[in-house]
A protein has these predicted regions:
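C-terminal catalytic/acceptor-binding lobe
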Residues: 2-16, 183-283
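Glycine-rich phosphate-binding loop at the start of an alpha helix
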Residues: 60, 64, 226
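Hydrophobic pocket-lining residues that define ligand/cofactor binding sites across diverse proteins
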Residues: 70, 99, 232
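Conserved catalytic core of nucleotide-sugar-dependent glycosyltransferases
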Residues: 67, 88-212
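Active-site nucleotide-sugar/metal-binding loop of Leloir-type enzymes
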Residues: 64-77
């Protein structure tokens, strides 16, 4: 999507990046992307704050604490970025440009794949010749994405698409969305456990914006991000996805090669410089 961004308008917004980070561990691609985002915001004069929550094992509680920290600040936009997500910092500015107070982008996110390899999609790409020129392109067909479209809708790749659910791994939420949520669902106020912090000492209530729950009508078990989207949509707000954004979702993978299988295929079991050179020439 071609989006004209007015930097002077973006400077009116303040970006609060929140990352729940159990064990204080993050991925290298996330670290590099966050550093690039910090540099980009500094270059354009956009105020940005990074907030990390370490050692909270319950993700629902961690996200609620992050939101409370945001709401007690004067920042305008909260961006959840999970510690295993790599991203293009320009996409963050695009989300901010789209999510103005006048727009109906109450929640807007980028699309990222789940940590799985969908071999049938890779096979389909190979059969259709998508990897004939460069086999490295097969990585584009890996994984199922973390969102569910609105039933009966058609998604256009080059513009924001309304969805029923999307993940918090790369999700922007403006302040007004949380305020409307709190107003519509006053029963979500609760007393947080004491966590040895001056802001969470059990003396005041905060809102439960995130919770995992079984949805009554469908019987589905909703994760905390899908539950949040469900509740937001139930009171007339909207959830959007930017299909053109490219995100990386890092995880562990077990490599299980098989020498007899490679022999049957007729390929080298070790690194073959000649085959690699052929691939590079085709790029």
């Amino acid at each position: 999507m071609e989006l004209k961004v007015k930097i002077e308008e973006l400077r009116k917004s303040k970006l609060f990046v929140a990352t729940p980070m159990y064990g204080g561990v993050c991925n290298g691609s996330y670290t590099r992307s966050l550093c690039d985002l910090s540099v980009l915001c500094s270059r354009y004069g956009i105020e940005m704050r990074s907030y990390f929550l370490f050692n909270e094992s319950l993700i629902t509680r961690a996200r609620n604490y992050c939101v409370d920290e945001f709401l007690r600040s004067d920042f305008t936009h909260l961006l959840f970025i999970d510690s295993d997500i790599g991203f293009n910092p320009n996409d963050v500015l695009a989300l901010m440009a789209l999510q103005t107070d006048e727009s109906d982008y109450d929640i807007i996110s980028g699309a990222y794949p789940k940590k799985c390899i969908t071999w049938e999609k890779i096979k389909s790409a190979v059969n259709k010749g998508f990897a004939d020129e460069n086999p490295n392109t097969l990585e584009q067909f890996v994984g199922d994405f973390v969102f569910n479209p609105v039933r009966g809708s058609t998604i256009k790749i080059n513009e924001p698409a309304e969805v029923s659910e999307t993940g918090t791994g790369f999700m922007m939420i403006r302040r007004k969305t949380f305020e409307q949520f709190a107003e519509k669902f006053p029963e979500t106020l609760y007393v947080p456990d004491h966590v040895r912090s001056e802001n969470f000492d059990g003396s005041r209530k905060i809102n439960m914006f995130f919770q995992a729950e079984i949805e009554k009508e469908s019987g589905r078990y909703l994760s905390e991000d899908y539950w949040f989207c469900f509740k937001v949509r139930s009171v007339g707000m909207k959830v959007w996805l930017c299909p053109w954004m490219h995100l990386q979702h890092s995880g562990y993978y077990t490599f299980a090669g098989n020498l007899p299988a490679m022999a049957a295929l007729g390929v080298s079991a070790t690194c073959d410089p000649e085959e690699i050179a052929k691939t590079k020439k085709k790029k």
